[in-house]
Swiss-Prot record:
NCBIfam families: metG, metG_C_term, PRK00133.1
Subcellular location: Cytoplasm
Protein name as catalogued: Methionine--tRNA ligase
Similarity comment text for this entry: Belongs to the class-I aminoacyl-tRNA synthetase family. MetG type 1 subfamily.
Species the sequence originates in: Bordetella avium (strain 197N)
Residues that, per the record, bind Zn(2+): C143, C146, C156, C159
UniProt feature coiled coil, ranges: none
Cofactor dependency: Zn(2+)
Amino acid sequence: MSRTLFVTTALPYANGSFHIGHIMEYIQADIWVRSMRMAGHTVHFVGADDAHGAPIMLKAEKEGITPQALVARYAAERPRYLDGFHIRFDHWHSTDSAENVALSHEIYRALKAAGLIETRSIEQFFDPVKGMFLADRYIKGECPRCHAKDQYGDSCEVCGAVYAPTELIQPYSALTGATPVLKRSDHFFFKLSDPRCVEFLQQWTTGSNRNGIKHLQSEVQAKTREWLGGEEGEAKLGDWDISRDAPYFGIEIPDAPGKYFYVWLDAPVGYLASLKSYCDKIGLDFDALLDPSSATEQVHFIGKDIIYFHALFWPAMLKFAGRKTPDALNVHGFITVSGEKMSKSRGTGISPLRYLEVGMDPEWLRYYMAAKLNARVEDMDFNPEDFIARVNSDLVGKYVNIASRAANFITRHFEGKLAYLGDTAALSAEFAQQTESIRAALEAREFNRAIREIMAYADGINQAFDAAQPWVLAKGFAEADEARRAQLQDICSRALAGFKALSVMLAPVLPALTSRVARDLFGAQRDFIWSDAADLPAQVAPFKHLMQRVDPQMLDALFEPPAELAAPAPTPGGEALADTISIDDFVKVDLRIAKIINCEEVEGSTKLLRLTLDAGEGRHRNVFSGIKSFYKPQDLIGKLTVLVANLAPRKMKFGVSEGMVLAASHADEKVDAGIYVLEPWPGAQPGMRIH
């Protein structure tokens, strides 16, 4: 039965060019969309630029241009990347559009009418020079715990402490250097903690769509249980501040002059705005297409770093605005290079534009990513040696090799005509069965399984061809009898029919190459669809070169050379290194190995865990740590960690903290939102001092 699908990828933020992570997500979605279309389904595949927010406003101001001009500059780059990698969106739009304004207003008004918008007066730091309220990332100061300088307004990168911006010592604006002042402002909150939202999300996150497809992968569902609680657990959802004060580049909130939607509210609405723009363009009824009762399936491809917004806020917003909720979130991991996080300074950064500029085939990358991606939330590793081997061995050595060998015999001896001995029904059925297995794997997003099956099938075709030894039959062809000629023609015809079937299987992954195969080699008038695999070809044109091998020197050119040691990255971890200290200063800090004897949540705190530590002193210490968002208490019990043992005890609202455990985090949550508690290597014992 034919299905109708509305498919999106996460919206790229319009203050920079595409990076390889964007391209990976777009290729994954594009392969899936092409596969669904080949099955006869109707797919509306749209994207857009995420064009609002303070970072865009401030970057444009720094460059002396308008935010719209900055967004337009990056929007103009998009086709070069998308076309370059054969990524075929139906429509590309912007959140800075009339459609997005109208839809954001409609959704907000519906949520307000449902009693899910609440106004609260909050106190924030305000930059008197800039004349704007400051987000945490734009406030710096001295950490109230370890007294490290130049720490951001919500957490310390040195000691891992989490705090409110008002707790910073000598805070200053990262924009102007001015001392911020506290100022009150009315903000609008979406009441995600409302029992109606909690009940809906507990059902939606564990549910399936009308086709029985789970809304969430098992890993994502498990993550949402941490926020929603299980059957016996209590939900830990906080209400969401959806407003920002002027000056702000965004969509003004209805009936609230000087108040704007926070970018994370109008950004996902941009999915709908892009579809609305596309529907208006081609004459489709947008409202009917996305009516809650319609059969349209709404599918979002996103990265694992934005699960919270897409699995909680987004479906709840849509549900209580009376709109269709998502049918599936397809979440993927990050991309690494040779097992490491990409880094320009280490020469492991991949620029998608550079990939194209050095002359590398975009379909090499599409194939390689398909060979590595699956339906789980796993990181994909790009290994240069593996990349070369897979392309040269699989695509050229196995797949293309079939056509180049068999077609030459057919064109030289049979004028391009194919003929088969015996009953061909079994051969057609075999192709149909194998192709259906590939189609199902691609629909399930098990791309790596599909590629393994395709290459195993190619191995079988090559082995059968080699075993038949057509080059022996071709010797003395002019004097050969009809039986021998027919046998040669049959062997090569079957190999080429197999090559055609393989091309159908690979069509979603290699759209440009398989289009040439369909049209130039087999004389088709259109690109392949799944059912074409079972139709045995009757004629081929002379073989033309299809794909070159990867030259290892291309990989050398792809990776940017490591930065000179004399010029390291100025802000590792998102911030500059602290001032140099002497060894005498360092030894004043007593760092000890400590074992976590117990760990529990702190009632009344959304950030803190209470750790009971054994530091080899014959007694236990009580330490509070702001790591609740990233660790379950039961997962920490029994672990070793690092304790600042001689830090003066600090009296807190919840008790006395007798030291500090060390943790690492990045200054910019958009780069890495995690907090990582330090854990010594096995063998270290509680009480050992770190030197």
